[in-house]
Design a protein with these regions (language model features):
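Long, polar/Ser/Thr-enriched low-complexity segments
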Residues: 1-113, 243
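Charged linear interaction tracts used for macromolecular binding and regulation
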Residues: 85-230
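Hydrophobic, glycine-enriched assembly/anchoring segments
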Residues: 3, 10-12, 221-244
Length: 244
């Protein structure tokens, strides 16, 4: 077998890599190139898109979320977006009226908003610039179940939209509605939240409840997860792209 002594070279020559460690010389085979299958590459790309979009939407909804630092919630939310994207291209998106995994997604609490707030509200898309939430007249003590000595309920509606291709937050809005917890009729309410969601965007609307009750004679917002609710009540994906 031929031998070469006093070789003073480092780097790659053909399929071999030459290098020194201390005063010793070594050679090893260069690693082969790994080529991703098209489906694997698409999934990897979409996972990155979902991660960026998830963060952008969470940032936009932050004031409505019970705990923005919940790592499990963050992972579940981005994972739900990634699962929906699957092998789709953001340039040719498709999506049902309500995206499975995202619609009714729980940001906090034990019960979805629609189960905790039993008034038959509706969420309508007015245009590419706004949404409208309508709540008919209701009696608070009959459509919500609060802890003992509940004084009032803080109801929040929030919306955020993002550009999926670049994961940029486009717009976000929040409305807080303080409702006395009693047997008096609350008149019908309509909330209009401006939120542009142009072609190529994903928009998420959430509903949330927190109960304000007496604790040792002092009004405090309940921290019991049984009386906290924040979940997705509407998803909208605008699939049409100019020139597409």
């Amino acid at each position: 077998m031929p031998q070469v002594k006093n070789l003073r070279v480092s780097g790659r020559i053909g399929p071999l890599i030459f290098y020194y460690v201390g005063d010793k010389f070594y050679a090893r085979a260069a690693p082969g190139k790994i080529k991703q299958a098209p489906k694997t590459k698409t999934r990897s790309t979409n996972f990155g898109i979902a991660s960026r979009a998830g963060k952008a939407l969470r940032d936009g909804l932050a004031d409505a979320l019970p705990n923005t630092k919940d790592r499990q919630m963050q992972s579940r939310f981005s994972g739900a977006i990634a699962k929906w994207l699957g092998l789709q291209s953001v340039k040719t998106l498709t999506g049902p009226a309500e995206i499975p995994g995202l619609f009714l997604f729980m940001f906090g609490g034990h019960v979805a908003f629609e189960e905790k707030f039993r008034a038959p509200f509706t969420v309508s898309i007015k245009s590419e610039e706004a949404i409208e939430i309508h709540v008919p007249a209701f009696i608070p003590a009959k459509v919500m179940s609060g802890p003992d000595d509940t004084l009032s309920v803080e109801c929040t509606f929030a919306v955020a939209s993002c550009d999926l291709a670049i994961g940029r937050l486009l717009e976000n809005k929040l409305v807080r509605w303080n409702i006395a917890y009693d047997n008096n009729i609350v008149p019908a309410q309509t909330f209009t939240l401006p939120c542009p969601h142009p072609p190529g965007s994903l928009m998420v609307v959430t509903g949330g409840l927190r109960f304000n009750a007496l604790k040792r004679g002092i009004p405090v917002m309940s921290e019991d997860p049984s009386y906290i609710s924040c979940s997705v009540i509407k998803t909208v994906v605008n699939v049409e792209r100019a020139g597409g």
